[in-house]
Structures are given as C-alpha cells and as structure tokens.
C-alpha cells in the first residue's frame, strides 16, 4: 500500500539579492543573497517542522543549479527539477522593502522556470507518496506553460484525492499584461485557500462591500472577512477553509492578526503589534506552512489559526526569506 505522506509544492526557486537601502553594499562590495520563492519558503518551513516535502521546480544545468539542488536536499526537501540550459530567476529587494510594492525588481524573464514546459516528470512520479499539493498564484502568472501545468496538476491532485491549497499571493508587477481573474479556473480544485480580502477581490472579483478606514481595530474587517468567505463558499463549495492575514504598517510599526473560516464560522487570532520589524519577506509563506502543518496534524481549528498567526508574526523578526531554527511550531 502506498504511503501517502508527502507535501508537494510547485513553484519557482529564486535568488533574492538584498542590498541595503543606503547603497553601502557598493563600497563594501558585499551583497546579501537569500534563496527564496513562495513555494520554496513554504517547503523549507514544513521540512524544518519534520514534514516530508517535495518541490517541483526547474533548475539550470550548471554549477548554480547543482549547488541549489544540494542545498534543498540538505534541508530535507526532495527535489523534482527538470534541468535545462539557462539561468535561475532573481529579484532585488532592499532589506527594508516590501514584496507588495514597487521597491521589488524582478529579473525572472527568461529563466529556466519561465521557459520550462514541465514535461520532465510523469504524473505518477510527481504524485508518488503525495497527500497534499500547494501552489501560490505567483506560479501561474509566470508563463502560459506554468498556468496550464497548475491547472493540470491541481485537477490531477483532486482525481487522486490529494488535498490542494492555494495562496492568493497578489503581485501587481506579475499581472500587468494579463487578467488575474483567470485564477478562477483553478478554484474548483482548491480545498484550502489563503490570502486576504483585497487579494480575493483582485483574483476572484468578490468585492469589498464594507467601508474600511484602514484602522487595525476596524470591526468592518471581520465583517468583510466573513462575508468574503461566505461568497467564496457559495461560488466554490469545495473550499473548506479560508484564511486571511491582516498586516498593517505605519512607518516601522506593525499590527497583525489573522482569521480562519472553517466549519461555517469565522475564527479570529490573537492580535500582535511591534514598534519595529526586521524583515517583510516570507511572513505569509510561513503562515501558509503553519496552516498546512496544523491541518495535516489534525489540530483543532483555533489552534491551527493561532499557531499560524504566531509563526507569521515571529517571521517578521527573522532575516531572509525563510524561517530559521528560532521558530519551532511545537514550542511557540
């Protein structure tokens, strides 16, 4: 009997160049580089928490690709990577920048991932021992091949009774020349959805109906989260859980909380705040990883939410794209 124990993530592996915002890296001739990519960040966290993880991606057929593959395997991640001539995708973001605004500069076209046809592995190879598939909406934005592969493997996952999660990760720069509403084509295969009320509006055309004042304590945020979740459930009844994260920044200060719609009720996490954070990248991915981890373990819904929110908030104080050993989900 097949041991369905692995979590499969499908997405592009990236190098994140992180120059300081003052430009001192030019004189010091020193530039911080992190390995990143939304699905990789999720995979790395899940592996650190002792889940069995596979990453379906593409790597260049050179020493950089070999070193990256070795790094992933060292982290306990099984790698399914079609290797071709080309280069790894990159992005530039200063250490105090935010992935959601114009301070990020992508250099991922062309890359081995955006040029791949993803035909290196059969469905049986991809889904061997897999019980969960995770994708973010970054991946289908990268190429028509990537979009069609997302549709195919999500459909195949459901045919194999594999749970599917989707992170509605909206990056405006990636959707400039295409309609984000095409993500609706993926929704019939999704069981667990993460995002926020604004990304749901962008991707699924479910409008924000309440007047929001941008205040962290605005009760209309919860009303809208509940209303949005009900509309998602109405349109896509296969979606069993809907998570929203709310992060508000004012200068260096941050306020944070999250919600989870499950069993037809809206759960709300503890609220967090800090006067200063260290890192804006990867918090949402760590939330997603914790959400998957909690569901796989069979934890109560409120604990799943609280753990995910706490992990995501803690990630704001960890440099780099992924969590480190300081964030142990079993000892929060």
Task: Please annotate each region the language model reported.
Residues 1-77, 97-99, 118, 276-280:
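Glycine-rich phosphate/adenosyl-contacting loop at the front of the ribokinase-like
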Residues 8-23, 254-270:
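Acidic-glycine-rich active-site phosphate/pyrophosphate-binding loop
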Residues 52-140, 166, 330-332:
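Conserved N-terminal subdomain of the carbohydrate kinase-like
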Residues 148-161, 181-189:
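Catalytic-core regions built around general acid/base machinery
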Residues 157-163, 236-240:
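A short helix->loop->beta-strand "cap" motif at the edges of active sites that frequently abuts
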Residues 267-332:
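Conserved post-catalytic alpha-helical subdomain immediately downstream of the catalytic base
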């Amino acid at each position: 009997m097949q041991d369905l124990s692995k979590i499969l993530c499908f997405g592009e592996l990236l190098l994140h160049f992180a120059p300081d915002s003052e430009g001192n890296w030019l004189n010091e001739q020193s530039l911080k580089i992190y390995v990143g990519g939304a699905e990789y960040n999720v995979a790395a966290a899940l592996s650190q928490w002792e889940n069995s993880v596979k990453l379906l991606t593409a790597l260049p057929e050179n020493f950089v690709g070999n070193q990256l593959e070795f790094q992933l395997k060292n982290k306990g991640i099984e790698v399914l990577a079609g290797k071709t001539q080309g280069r790894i995708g990159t992005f530039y973001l200063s250490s105090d920048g935010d992935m959601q605004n114009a301070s990020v500069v992508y250099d991922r076209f062309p890359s081995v991932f955006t040029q791949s046809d993803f035909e290196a592995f059969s469905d049986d190879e991809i889904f061997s021992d897999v019980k969960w598939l995770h994708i973010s909406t970054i991946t289908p934005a990268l190429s028509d091949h990537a979009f069609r592969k997302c549709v195919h493997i999500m459909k195949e996952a459901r045919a194999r009774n594999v749970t599917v999660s989707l992170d509605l990760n909206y990056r405006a720069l990636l959707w400039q020349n295409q309609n984000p509403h095409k993500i609706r084509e993926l929704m019939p295969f999704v069981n667990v959805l993460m995002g926020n009320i604004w990304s749901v509006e962008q991707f699924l055309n479910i409008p924000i109906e309440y007047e929001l004042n941008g205040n962290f304590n605005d009760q209309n945020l919860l009303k809208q989260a509940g209303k949005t979740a009900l509309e998602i459930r109405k349109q896509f009844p296969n979606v069993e859980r809907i998570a929203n994260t709310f992060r508000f920044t004012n200068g260096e200060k941050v306020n944070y909380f999250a919600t989870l719609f499950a069993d037809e009720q809206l759960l709300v996490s503890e609220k967090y705040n800090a006067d200063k954070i260290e890192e804006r990248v990867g918090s949402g991915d760590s939330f997603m990883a914790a959400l998957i981890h909690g569901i796989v373990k069979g934890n109560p819904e409120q604990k799943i939410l609280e753990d995910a929110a706490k992990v995501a908030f803690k990630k704001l104080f960890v440099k780099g794209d992924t969590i480190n050993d300081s964030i142990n989900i079993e000892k929060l």
